């Protein structure tokens, strides 16, 4: 083994779970080549920052992380700073010029070559850039080092996006939508489950588009059936399901497949037709309202999550009032709100009637306040119910309390359950009775068998 391969590597992954999978692939490739992976950035010879560039706040977070870690080159062990992902894919020349502390820039199409690129850099001293066409798609033969807790993992079922939302830069950063083959996904899922994973969370830019670019009859529902046949897999969770792609077949599967969590993340972005049309979304207000009502009616107890954008160009006072009233009526269990970010190169950036930052922030505050009331009522209604909870560790406040998630809660983005009684191993799925609630979290007692 070369001295290069004995170096320690640390990874900082920013942004969404899809980014996290890319980071895990890079770590897997490096570990396979003999690099030692460390969680301690102070020990690392090589630090990789896997960046997000979706909106302004994500870019700022990425740049702040890069600048912070650049200091490690002067006061720590770090000799090589790598910036990967969406930020260099979008701003390679600017980063190379403004951040000379960065040694390597890797775009979204070159993750599997990370070890090769490091070797090339160490053979010379110059800053190097690998930012080509974003045509990479994860292959199951690539090693992947799961950085999530061992009982759950994200399964990236496709790459890129073929939607044409006027506010979004993702298609230019990730390319058109490409589905991964069913057999490849099943093979990866089986490997993850064999390693102890009990919950698979399906992700891509638009999971309902899965199979639409393939010549066979592959579909999201068909993929779920194949995954559900894996013996020791307990939960399958769906994130990023576009409303216009939710099929009758998928709705039926929620009724019949016990491993499919009664949970659906549907990013609708807005409800007013005026805004939806300017966003170039494919669903209308009537279609969205009909879908939400149908899901509530046909799948009793389903947990619905969505994301919304406030302050989009041309959003009027009436549009925002309509959105607020819709949030009250739809009663989403979970909801995220983003202020519109004016992204260079997108059609929306050139639209008239841009909304001021002050108005955006005020609308964000009002909508989150509305949702807090909804969430409190939804959680309060769960008191007295029995739920299956996956145990994830001890509470930050005291080791006398366990914490976990019900099947109604996704990792990181939803609340937690604090378990006040009983004993279980981390990763166990146990029955708990909900005894109390807050806006976003639950309290429960374990039901002893």
Swiss-Prot record:
Tell me the ranges covered by the TRAM domain, including all copies. Answer: 380-448
Keyword vocabulary terms for this entry = 4Fe-4S, Cytoplasm, Iron, Iron-sulfur, Metal-binding, S-adenosyl-L-methionine, Transferase
Broadest EC class assigned to this enzyme = transferase
Q: Please tell me whether the keyword Iron-sulfur is annotated for this protein.
A: yes
In the Enzyme Commission scheme, what number(s) does this protein have?
2.8.4.4
Q: Where would you find this protein in the cell? A: Cytoplasm
Might you report a single GO cellular component term?
cytosol
Q: Entry's InterPro entries? A: Elp3/MiaA/NifB-like_rSAM, Methylthiotransferase, Methylthiotransferase_CS, Methylthiotransferase_N, Methylthiotransferase_N_sf, NA-bd_OB-fold, Ribosomal_uS12_MeSTrfase_RimO, rSAM
Which reactions is this enzyme annotated as catalysing? L-aspartate(89)-[ribosomal protein uS12]-hydrogen + (sulfur carrier)-SH + AH2 + 2 S-adenosyl-L-methionine = 3-methylsulfanyl-L-aspartate(89)-[ribosomal protein uS12]-hydrogen + (sulfur carrier)-H + 5'-deoxyadenosine + L-methionine + A + S-adenosyl-L-homocysteine + 2 H(+)
Positions of [4Fe-4S] cluster 2 binding:
161, 165, 168
One Gene Ontology term of the molecular function aspect: protein methylthiotransferase activity
Whose protein is this, by species? Trichlorobacter lovleyi (strain ATCC BAA-1151 / DSM 17278 / SZ) (Geobacter lovleyi)
Task: List where this protein forms a coiled coil.
Answer: none
MTTase N-terminal domain ranges (all copies)? 7-123
Write out the function statement from the record.
Catalyzes the methylthiolation of an aspartic acid residue of ribosomal protein uS12.
**Gene name of the encoded protein:** rimO
List cofactor names only: [4Fe-4S] cluster
Q: Which family does it belong to?
A: Belongs to the methylthiotransferase family. RimO subfamily.
**Domain Radical SAM core per the UniProt entry, residue ranges:** 147-377
The record's listing under PROSITE patterns reads: MTTASE_N, MTTASE_RADICAL, RADICAL_SAM, TRAM
Q: Which domain of life is it from?
A: Bacteria
* A biological process from GO: tRNA modification
Q: What binding details are noted for the cofactor?
A: Binds 2 [4Fe-4S] clusters. One cluster is coordinated with 3 cysteines and an exchangeable S-adenosyl-L-methionine.
Please indicate if the UniProt record lists Metal-binding as a keyword: yes
Q: Could you identify this protein by its name?
A: Ribosomal protein uS12 methylthiotransferase RimO
- What positions does the entry give for [4Fe-4S] cluster 1 binding? 16, 52, 86
Q: CDD domains under this entry?
A: Radical_SAM (cd01335)
The protein's matches in Pfam families, at most eight in alphabetical order, are given as: Radical_SAM, TRAM_2, UPF0004
């Amino acid at each position: 083994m070369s001295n290069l391969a004995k170096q320690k590597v640390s990874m900082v992954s920013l942004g969404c779970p899809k980014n996290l999978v890319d980071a895990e692939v890079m770590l897997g490739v490096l570990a396979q080549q003999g690099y030692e992976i460390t969680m301690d950035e102070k020990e690392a010879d090589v630090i990789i920052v896997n960046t997000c560039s979706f909106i302004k706040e994500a870019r700022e977070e990425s740049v702040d992380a890069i600048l912070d870690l650049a200091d490690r080159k002067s006061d720590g062990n770090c000799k090589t700073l790598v910036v990967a992902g969406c930020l260099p894919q979008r701003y390679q020349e600017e980063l190379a010029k403004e951040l000379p502390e960065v040694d390597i820039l890797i775009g979204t199409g070159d993750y599997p070559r990370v070890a090769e690129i490091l070797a090339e850099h160490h053979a010379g001293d110059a800053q190097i850039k690998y930012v080509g066409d974003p045509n990479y798609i994860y292959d199951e033969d690539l090693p992947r080092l799961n950085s999530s807790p061992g009982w759950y993992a994200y399964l990236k079922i496709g790459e890129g996006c073929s939607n044409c939302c006027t506010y979004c830069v993702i298609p230019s950063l990730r390319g058109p939508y490409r589905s991964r083959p069913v057999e490849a996904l099943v093979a990866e899922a089986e490997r993850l489950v064999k390693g102890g994973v009990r919950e698979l969370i399906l992700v891509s830019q638009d999971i309902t588009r899965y199979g639409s670019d393939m010549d066979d009859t592959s579909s999201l529902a068909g993929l779920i059936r194949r995954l559900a046949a894996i013996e020791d897999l307990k939960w399958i969770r769906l994130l990023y399901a576009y409303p216009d792609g939710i099929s009758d077949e998928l709705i039926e599967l929620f009724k019949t497949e016990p491993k499919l969590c009664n949970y659906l993340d549907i990013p609708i972005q807005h409800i007013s037709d005026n805004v939806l049309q300017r966003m170039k979304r494919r669903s209308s207000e009537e279609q969205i309202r009909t879908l939400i009502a149908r899901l509530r009616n046909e799948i009793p107890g389903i947990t619905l999550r969505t994301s919304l954008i406030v302050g989009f160009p041309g959003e009027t006072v009436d549009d925002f009032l309509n959105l607020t009233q819709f949030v009250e009526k739809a009663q989403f269990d979970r909801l995220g709100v983003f202020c519109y970010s004016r992204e260079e190169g997108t059609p929306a950036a050139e639209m008239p009637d841009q909304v001021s930052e002050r108005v955006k922030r005020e609308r964000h505050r009002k909508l989150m306040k509305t949702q807090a009331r909804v969430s409190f009522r939804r959680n309060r209604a769960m008191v007295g119910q029995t739920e299956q909870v996956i145990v994830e560790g001890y509470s930050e406040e005291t080791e006398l309390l366990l914490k976990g998630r019900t099947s109604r809660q996704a990792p990181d983005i939803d609340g937690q359950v604090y378990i006040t009684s009983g004993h279980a191993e981390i990763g166990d799925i146990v029955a708990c009775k909900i005894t109390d609630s807050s806006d976003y979290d639950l309290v429960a007692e374990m039901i002893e068998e």
